Amino acid sequence: MLVSGMLLVVVLTCLSVMIIMSVWRQRRLLRKMPPGPTPLPFIGNFLELDTEKFYDCLSKMRERYGPVFTIHLGPRPAVMLWGYDAVKEALIDQAEELSDRGEQAFFDWFFKGYGVVFSSGERAKQLRRFSIATLRDFGFGKRGIEERTIEETSFLIQALRDTNGATIDPTFYMSRTVSNVISSIVFGNRFEYDDKEFLSLLGMIMRSFQFMSTSTGQLFEMFYSVMKHLPGCQHQAYKEMQGLEDFIARKVEENQRTLDPNSPRDFIDSFLIRMQEEKKNPRTQFHMRNLLMTTLNLFFAGTETVSTTTRYGFLLLMKYPHIAAKMHEEIDQVIGRNRQPKYEDHLKMPYTEAVIYEIQRFVDVVPLGLPRSTTKDIKFRDFLIPKGTDVFPVLSSVLKDPKFFSNPNDFNPQHFSDDKGQFKKSNAFMPFSVGKRYCFGESLAKMELFIFFTTIMQNFCFKSPQAPQDIDVTPQYFSFAAIPPKFTMSFLPR
């Protein structure tokens, strides 16, 4: 009895020492982290962060603490990187140490670390390598996907002609077109524009994407451990994601029934074949959960980001009609009114290219960027960032860095034009992020945006119910994503 009592005391003493040492080490590390406002227990810096003006709050903190600072999203610390220099030093110069995915509470709640976008470590590396190779096989970066994009754009042009110049909301017109391009790769087919299930899926994507940028979405990022047990619209957003997963699961079942291992038809087939090849590997990352989540990643990201950018671009071109007029002029000179635009035309159209880049810079569709996580304790500048710390590359601060863009808050294509009117690249053009976890859909997105804008503007002029000076381009939401204000417009045949 005495021996067992002494053993218990020893065990408890050892545990106490370990806990004290762990707390001491954590506090020691926190003291060496980048500066920031003092957090309160549990709520962190909630009182300093206005969820409706999240970016503005961060901007003020940057003025006080410098380009590398720490905030506490609820109880968890997060390092914010502000401006090109800080983001480049972290994501490029220390790419491997920042190659894990940071915490994105809502998506982590749903994806649980599966899928190519929200996974880390070896899982992320294998899925990313496979996804890039497979998408390339199905035309990524080649004429195959360009031909699909051109074909899909022809359906859009006809749909816009059928409006007969009426005032419409362009949202679902663009999301249907963009989504059909990625659908042809991951599902092997496109959807008819009046397909009710397709329209339902697009609604699910849009609503869950917008939820992330609402005040409730920002609160969930800070207090998810509590809020996922409370009533609220976070549960509806979760159901939207579940609806998307259910649809993909049905698609996978269809492919399984008709699979020919020697002739993959789409991304799902290729993944199923890889699953069969590795079924005896106990450590394989090619299993059903990763198939569902990776396909959902591609379908979601391949639909909403380009659709939002294009829609926002329409609004900007209506506010600045002189810019649209110069694009029309260049399109007529280089392509004409009858020939179908091709992506190779962008090499001969410096003004149009500059406008499309400026739209992406100004729209800034994912302002904070997706967070990274440190794979080990790292030294960054004069600071120590502990392993597992979330690091946000604030992409908006790079895209609006005054060192690279003379008037960063103005919409001005001259940001991407030299003195001779030729297209000028910028190292600070990072809407797709950089480093080990950059968006591998970048080449597809650039090609899509060029084909969409040139083909639509070859055929139509844009008209707003409002005078240009009255058009408000302030985003409806600006935190996780930049969501344009609701607007209507007319597509008038040229």
UniProtKB/Swiss-Prot annotation:
EC code(s) of this entry: 1.14.14.1
Origin: domain of life: Eukaryota
Residues annotated to bind heme: C439
GO cellular component: endoplasmic reticulum membrane
Cross-referenced SUPFAM superfamilies: Cytochrome P450 (SSF48264)
PROSITE patterns assigned: CYTOCHROME_P450
Stimuli inducing this protein: By 3-methylcholanthrene (3MC).
Gene Ontology biological process terms in this record: coumarin metabolic process; epoxygenase P450 pathway; xenobiotic metabolic process
Its membrane topology: Peripheral membrane protein
Subcellular location: Endoplasmic reticulum membrane; Microsome membrane
Major enzyme class: oxidoreductase
InterPro entries per the UniProt record, alphabetical: Cyt_P450, Cyt_P450_CS, Cyt_P450_E_grp-I, Cyt_P450_E_grp-I_CYP2A-like, Cyt_P450_sf, Cytochrome_P450_fam2
Cofactor(s) this protein requires: heme
Keywords from the named record: Endoplasmic reticulum, Heme, Iron, Membrane, Metal-binding, Microsome, Monooxygenase, Oxidoreductase
Record field: catalytic activity: an organic molecule + reduced [NADPH--hemoprotein reductase] + O2 = an alcohol + oxidized [NADPH--hemoprotein reductase] + H2O + H(+)
Function: Highly active in 7-ethoxycoumarin O-deethylation, and benzphetamine N-demethylation; moderately active in testosterone 7-alpha-hydroxylation, ethylmorphine N-demethylation, p-nitroanisole O-demethylation; and only slightly active in benzopyrene 3-hydroxylation, 7-ethoxyresorufin O-deethylation, testosterone 2-alpha-hydroxylation and testosterone 17-oxidation. Competent in the metabolic activation of aflatoxin B1.
Family indicated by similarity: Belongs to the cytochrome P450 family.
Protein name: Cytochrome P450 2A8
Gene name as annotated: CYP2A8
